[in-house]
Amino acid sequence: MAVAPTAREENVYMAKLAEQAERYEEMVEFMEKVSNSLGSEELTVEERNLLSVAYKNVIGARRASWRIISSIEQKEESRGNEEHVNSIREYRSKIENELSKICDGILKLLDAKLIPSAASGDSKVFYLKMKGDYHRYLAEFKTGAERKEAAESTLTAYKAAQDIATTELAPTHPIRLGLALNFSVFYYEILNSPDRACNLAKQAFDEAIAELDTLGEESYKDSTLIMQLLRDNLTLWTSDMQDDGADEIKEDPKPDEAKN
């Protein structure tokens, strides 16, 4: 007779099912149930990747919507179409409320459960990086004091992650590389510091290249993919400093993307 799955196993299975169906809001709900049922135990690598993928898709859809609406708003403003601009601003505000709610949800979970229960170096860096990412997403659309606060929280989280990564993870470790990628994007996009962005990305790339021969087969694909993204951004940013380019800046891919 088959052993009945535990509630944890059932929720993980349902999260995978929701992912296949591209129902990411429900995937978030299932993975939050897993996270909240753990006590002081930490998520497995598979579970934390599922949680990350769920939230990345939910937030990613809204970030894309916000960028499209903001671009339309700028065009209508330049045409002096005030009536349309007012409608667009209202709609943008609705998307921003959704973005805030999603970020607040994962940030609460990270602070209350995931970061305190993280035991290994890679899980600490993973969750602190995640904390930095979601504060950065807030900084993308917040203004004034709220933007300043979100940017400061991003910097604090990324720096804490970086301190652990440089002492506990190899330069070729995908999580360390992903952190360097997103931290450099933060310097470039949020702090408007292209020099610091390029220095951080170049240092991470050079350190990984120097140890490429030590890479294990299981993380080779993930690491080299992120290294390529670091190089793409460096190319884009150095050309942008010479002219005003508008190509897409690359961020750390979702865990499932890195494995394809």
UniProtKB/Swiss-Prot annotation:
- Specify the superkingdom: Eukaryota
Q: Which GO BP annotation is one of this protein's?
A: protein localization
| InterPro entries with a match to the protein in the record | 14-3-3, 14-3-3_CS, 14-3-3_dom_sf, 14-3-3_domain
Q: Name one GO cellular component term.
A: cytoplasm
Xref: Gene3D superfamilies: 14-3-3 domain
Q: Name one Pfam family in it.
A: 14-3-3
Say which family it is in: Belongs to the 14-3-3 family.
- Which PANTHER family does the entry mention? 14-3-3 PROTEIN
Q: Name it.
A: 14-3-3-like protein C
Q: Which organism is it from?
A: Nicotiana tabacum (Common tobacco)
